[in-house]
Amino acid sequence: MRESEIENYLIWSVETLGGRAWKFKSPNQRGVSDRIVCLPNGETWFVELKRPKGGRLAPLQAIFRDEVVRLQQRYALLTNKKEIDEWTHEYRIRSLIG
């Protein structure tokens, strides 16, 4: 499965929840996550997508991830449809108990 297929599945999954998954490009800052995801319960996530086999974070992507986590923001690295399904399932649970 290609990364673009995973990305399209993420967009579809987020939109079925009523959220948005915007493409994130920053010309002056390499390593930023692929998508900023805003969910209806107020959660905002920085989401990096990689292909299932061999997809690894580049050094600048790891630095970005560490900075996002240090700032106590939400970050996810998703590599396949199953992980996206689990991630959206966890969101649904948080929404029910939150």
Labelled PLM ranges:
Residues 1-98:
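Catalytic phosphate/metal-binding cores of nucleic-acid and nucleotide-processing enzymes, i.e., regions
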